[in-house]
């Protein structure tokens, strides 16, 4: 069992109070934070880095690469941090008028979506707003990029594809009967998967808009999707506390981890040998299929966090 320590906290000076304790116990499968009422004594506090530029409300999403970390917040802004310069803020992105719910970026662009029903495309190098995409009629809950194409999904039941250079809506996928929480491109950009409050997962042909597969997937809102294009598998996580693995080609359920979390599953990701999930419990669970069956790592945190309009928050970065 591995224990993992928090090395750095970025935020306002008050982000860690004097009563906040961080406990780390070797050999025990927990890692958690506690309030002042607990009598345990922490071995050490993580380093706190505070800058004049910081978020004034909950951070709802983040992404990072080797150079920058970008965060989106309920304060309607994003902050870009320089990872190689002690995580100093480079700039703040301001244009949304409500909470930033998701973001994505590549070497040229940063794309953000918001409860204000819009998507913003920013120049990564300068922070300039290049264009604002409008077309959804509900909160835009998720965005992802593949080349010069953006996929978005919304509480308006729709998935949309956009050209990042022109801002034009290329295609629209209709069929879901309730609001959507997540959408994903396949690695080659040929397929799009979407899911949400109607408890189903749909797989679409990105070029034609045809719904290829519809899976009656879960007993509650499907909060998270992740496509592993190498294996052709799709991982879903739901408010029903289950994580499931699907065959993309056939729509067949391959694996089911019932009641994997004690509460809502907020995010589930995978690579060639692991599934990593976060929940409202609050836990991070790591299933390593390359190790012994009992080798499950669990990291526990503070109390459950609730995001806008009933959707709990969860970072999208995957370590």
Where are these regions (language model features)?
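Intrinsically disordered, low-complexity acidic/Ser/Thr/Pro-rich linker and tail segments
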Residues: 1-68, 72-79, 273-274, 288-319
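Conserved strand-to-loop turn within each blade of WD40 beta-propeller repeats
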Residues: 72-75, 113-116, 153-156, 177-181, ...
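WD40-repeat beta-propellers
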Residues: 11, 78-82, 103, 119-123, ...
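A structural motif specific to WD40 beta-propellers
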Residues: 46-49, 88-91, 128-131, 168-171, ...
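Conserved beta-strand position repeated across blades of beta-propeller domains
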Residues: 61-63, 104, 144, 184, ...
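WD40/WD-repeat beta-propeller blade-loop signature
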Residues: 55-58, 89, 96-99, 129, ...
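WD40/WD-repeat beta-propeller blade N-cap
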Residues: 52-59, 94-100, 134-140, 174-180, ...
């Amino acid at each position: 069992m591995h224990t993992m320590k928090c090395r750095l906290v970025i935020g306002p000076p008050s982000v860690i109070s004097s009563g906040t304790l961080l406990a780390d116990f070797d050999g025990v499968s927990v890692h958690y934070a506690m309030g002042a009422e607990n009598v345990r004594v922490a071995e050490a506090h993580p380093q706190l880095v505070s800058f004049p530029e910081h978020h004034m409300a909950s951070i709802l999403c983040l992404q990072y690469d080797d150079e920058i970390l970008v965060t989106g917040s309920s304060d309607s802004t994003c902050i870009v941090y320089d990872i190689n310069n002690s995580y100093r803020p480079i700039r703040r992105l301001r244009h949304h008028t409500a909470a930033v719910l998701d973001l994505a970026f590549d070497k040229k662009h940063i794309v953000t979506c918001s409860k204000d029903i819009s998507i913003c495309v920013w120049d990564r190098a300068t922070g300039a707003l290049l264009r604002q995409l409008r077309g959804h009629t509900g909160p835009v809950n998720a965005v992802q990029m593949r080349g010069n194409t953006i996929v978005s999904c919304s509480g308006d039941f729709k998935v949309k594809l956009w050209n990042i250079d022109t801002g034009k809506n290329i295609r629209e996928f209709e069929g879901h009967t309730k609001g959507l929480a997540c959408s994903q491109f396949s690695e080659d950009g040929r397929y799009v998967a979407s899911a949400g409050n109607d408890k189903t997962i749909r797989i679409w042909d990105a070029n034609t808009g045809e719904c290829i597969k519809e899976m009656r997937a879960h007993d509650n809102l499907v909060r998270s999707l992740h496509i592993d294009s190498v294996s052709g598998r799709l991982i879903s996580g739901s408010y029903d506390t289950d994580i499931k693995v699907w065959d993309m080609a056939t729509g067949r359920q391959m694996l089911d981890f019932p009641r994997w979390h004690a509460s809502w599953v907020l995010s589930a990701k995978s690579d060639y040998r692991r599934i990593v999930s976060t929940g409202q419990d609050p836990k991070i669970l790591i299933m390593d299929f390359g190790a012994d069956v009992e080798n499950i790592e669990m990291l526990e945190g503070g109390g459950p966090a609730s995001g806008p309009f009933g959707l709990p928050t969860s970072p999208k970065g995957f370590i």
